[in-house]
């Protein structure tokens, strides 16, 4: 199959295999070794060994070759708890009340086009309201295979296909389907590299753009890259998020959220749609 359209422009990436086409030759071996290790670590673990929590599984993409596995993952998780929106999850944490049961709140980072084409139909079919954190400067963008930002900021390893992002029309369509559009900054930057004033502008300008274009409140923020004190400053940027009018800040820390936990320190579990049940069982049973 050709990697370019009739006009010579690289066609959009459609599969995870295309997204990772330039992985080194030993990448499959590393993935196999990791899978074997996780199978061993998952022995005896159960997602429902504990209760009274909210977990925040998050993804970046659902490409064509990931759709079936993504649907299978959601159906698997539905056997252990209830899916709730980030608005409801944060309201529960804000209340300080008891969390009675097990809840999953799904989100996606970066705003790739596959959120619309791959994830949305599967989520909507199941009545799941997911959050999508978008980079507002990337709305409507298409990055070439050799684009430095595509590789540096979004982990793109495509060979002959481009990386396509959501448009504002896409975001409005998703919002009409019950999805929630959150901010992943104006640009995909490490807030830790910025002064407080510049960081505040990233939060406030992206929030304003989303509210203007989508016509709904943008109440949730997720710093790019996600690791506190490395990629952003938890105290400083949490304070900036509160002052800007956000209700939550999502991190890349793994683990469950429980009664009394701070919605400006949301822990989330990164997943890939193609992973098997043993991988979900391991990561979603961690404290």
Model-derived features: where do they sit?
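Active-site beta->alpha N-cap acidic-glycine motif
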Residues: 51-69, 82, 86-180, 187, ...
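Short beta-strand and adjacent tight-turn residues that come in two discontinuous sequence segments
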Residues: 133, 184, 249-251
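A short secondary-structure junction signal
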Residues: 143-144, 192-194
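Short, flexible active-site loops
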Residues: 184-192
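C-terminal active-site subregion of NodB/CE4 polysaccharide deacetylases
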Residues: 2-107, 113-114, 193-287
């Amino acid at each position: 199959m050709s990697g370019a359209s009739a006009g010579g422009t690289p066609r959009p990436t459609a599969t995870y295999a295309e997204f990772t086409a330039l992985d080194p030759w030993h990448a499959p071996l590393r993935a196999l070794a990791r899978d074997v290790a996780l199978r061993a670590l998952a022995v005896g673990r159960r997602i429902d060994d504990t209760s009274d929590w909210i977990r925040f599984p998050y993804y970046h993409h659902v490409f064509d070759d990931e759709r079936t596995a993504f649907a299978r993952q959601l159906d698997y998780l539905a056997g252990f708890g209830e899916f709730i929106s980030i608005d409801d999850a944060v309201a529960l944490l804000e209340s300080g009340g008891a969390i009675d049961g097990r809840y999953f709140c799904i989100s996606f980072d970066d705003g790739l086009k596959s959120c619309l084409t791959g994830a949305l139909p599967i989520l909507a079919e199941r009545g799941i309201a997911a959050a999508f954190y978008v980079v507002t400067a990337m709305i409507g963008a298409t990055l070439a295979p050799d684009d430095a930002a595509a590789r540096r900021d979004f982990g793109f390893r495509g060979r002959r296909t481009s990386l396509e992002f959501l448009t504002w029309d896409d975001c409005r369509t998703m919002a009409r389907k019950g999805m929630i559009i959150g901010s992943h900054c104006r640009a995909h930057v490490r807030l830790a590299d910025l002064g407080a004033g510049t960081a505040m502008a990233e939060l406030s300008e992206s929030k304003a753009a989303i509210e203007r274009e989508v016509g709904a409140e943008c109440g949730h923020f997720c710093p790019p890259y996600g690791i506190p004190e490395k990629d952003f400053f938890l105290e400083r940027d949490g304070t900036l998020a509160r002052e800007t009018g956000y209700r939550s800040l999502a991190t890349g820390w793994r683990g469950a959220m429980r009664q009394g936990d701070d919605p400006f320190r949301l822990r989330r579990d990164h997943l890939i749609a193609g992973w098997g049940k043993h991988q979900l069982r391991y990561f979603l049973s961690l404290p």
